[in-house]
Amino acid sequence: MWFLNSVNLLFLVCSVALHLDAVNAWSPTNGYAPGVVDCDENINLVRKADAVSDDEADWLKVRHESTVPALKDFLQRGFKGFTNDTSIIDKLLATQDTAPKVAIACSGGGYRAMLSGAGMISAMDNRTDGANDHGLGGLLQSSTYLAGLSGGNWLVGTLAYNNWTSVQAIINNMTDDNSIWDISNSIVNPGGINIFSSISRWDDISDAVEEKKKAGFNTSITDVWGRALSYNFFPSLDEGGVGYTWNTLRDVDVFKNGEMPFPISVAVGRYPGTQVVNLNATVFEFNPFEMGSWDYTLHTFTDVRYAGTNVTNGTPNVTGKCVAGFDNTGFVMGTSSSLFNQFLLQLNTTDLPSFLYNLLHGFLTDASDDYDDISIWAPNPFYEITNIPSNYSQSISEDDTLYLVDGGEDGQNIPLTPLLQTEREIDVIFALDNSADTDQSWPDGFSLTQTYARQFGLQGKGIAFPYVPDVNTFTNLGLNTRPTFFGCDARNLTDLESIPPLVVYMPNTRESFNSNTSTFKMSYSTSERFKMIQNGFEAVTMKNLTKDENFMGCISCAILRRKQESLNYTLPSECDACFEKYCWNGTVDATTPISSTTSSSASSTSTSDSGNKENSARILAPRSTLSLLIGGLASVFISF
């Protein structure tokens, strides 16, 4: 309860200022529409995905200057009272080359994932009151990468693009009007009883999207969705950052100085009209420098600043002229969560006043056409690229339009793929799972099984992922109710293409609040937001370290494990007990669980949105989750 009590005691006014360069921060039109800008006459905007970009490599050198001392401090605190043998910390943290590289992945799951994930992240942030004493404070400061998908990307994007604000700062201001994550009212009816406020909001959104359309760019419902979301994430900016661009972050001091992790947003490639999204779909990432994919169906990145430029194999069709402003921050965040476009399309199930319904229905129908859950990136920045191997489909490069969808539509609801690239040399990934896999909307490890299976398919070239059990085993062994380590012994992973990072799986589970809310619950009271965040904090800390006082020490062992193995160093003997307790030991129980709930509580009041997903009883069982998604969407009813 300490976390909520600290929230009740703190009513400090903490402004979240955006230190942005006026030229670089916005679209050249100062609005939502992209515009033409001058660029180098010899510029080529694409590169082969055979390494991290030069910009990322340069940034990593700066970031490591912050992560190494932060990680050393974290590990020393973790070992205090846990072991007297701290020699390995000094050995590994002596240089940047031997220091473990940490990444965090935030799953999708709507506002549930955003809020529960916020609690999880806050437990790792030394800026959170009590995180150093009752949580994993400093782990966020020790991390190099922070990936988000759908609702998890709302969390990552909010923090990153509000000048790396903290969850604590958001909480401190949560009772203020127009604060970050002020979602007391639905996104469709943001004004609540003030219907004129809602009309004004949607009128502004309509005008913004129309500006993009008049500028000659295709629009879809994702433009509407992204614009609507932005008001909740960037309330201090004009019209929710109507001209705020994704690439802006590269020019912001807190990022340039390496004071925050490298943010990554994830989406998946798909064509409109198709109903197949499986593990062979192309996984796209957006970072402050680039957008593109490591997958061999693309294997290319492009400068995200100039997305929207007509190109052929990366060369602008008009010499010396590029387009800027297409990479609107809300549009990128909307692309990663485009599944929620269906929410806007269900207006006939709402209790909106007729005149607001008519306004929205006409606007959204015109905007959506046949692209219900698709984000349109046109012109295609990868048109006629030549980096795709001949034995892979060339379809992405052959179309003049790039179609992207919600990053979780391929079943990989935790954005792990960008973090598994050997070029990034990550040693440990903290996988925060706020999925709604079971009938009661708790996670059951399904996302991990999909990522594991993907490495053996067409798109698995170049990646490796630790062995994981089937989803029934996750539930039967309770692996989805507590933190679990996967890939603890590199000697058992030699059959894989490479030695993958150790994965620390941290699922949403009930500690003090029923956090298994519906993915499509689109409004949360202030009290609900506080409780969701508090429960998330408790879920990743073994309830504020009360269930295991050595938990931080065990997390420290997990962080050190890969580097210790590769350099043949010795961990403290106390780590053996940690691995015995938290590592999955290969036991499988694939029988159908008696109950599919993962809550530690005997009851739940959540609305299910998991559909009729049939849990696989095999480790290797890739399959599409589109039927699940459609089934869930068909029963969506919006209430205000």
Curated annotation (Swiss-Prot):
The EC number(s) this enzyme carries: 3.1.1.5
Glycosylation sites: 84, 126, 163, 173, 218, 280, 310, 317, 348, 391, 492, 516, 544, 568, 585
GO BP of this protein: glycerophospholipid catabolic process
Domain PLA2c: 38-589
Cystine pairings recorded for this chain: none
Molecular function per GO: lysophospholipase activity; phospholipase A2 activity
InterPro entries on file: Acyl_Trfase/lysoPLipase, LysoPLipase_cat_dom
Reaction equations catalysed: a 1-acyl-sn-glycero-3-phosphocholine + H2O = sn-glycerol 3-phosphocholine + a fatty acid + H(+)
Keyword Nucleus listed: no
Lineage: superkingdom: Eukaryota
Record Gene3D superfamilies: Cytosolic phospholipase A2 catalytic domain (3.40.1090.10)
Comp. bias intervals (Low complexity): 594-610
Chain intervals for the UniProt region annotation (Disordered): 594-616
Function: Catalyzes the release of fatty acids from lysophospholipids. At acidic pH the enzyme hydrolyzes all phospholipid substrates without metal ion. On the other hand, at alkaline pH the enzyme shows substrate specificity for phosphatidylcholine and lysophosphatidylcholine and requires Ca(2+), Fe(3+), or Al(3+) for the activity.
PANTHER family: CYTOSOLIC PHOSPHOLIPASE A2, LYSOPHOSPHOLIPASE 1-RELATED
Family under the similarity heading: Belongs to the lysophospholipase family.
Name of protein: Lysophospholipase
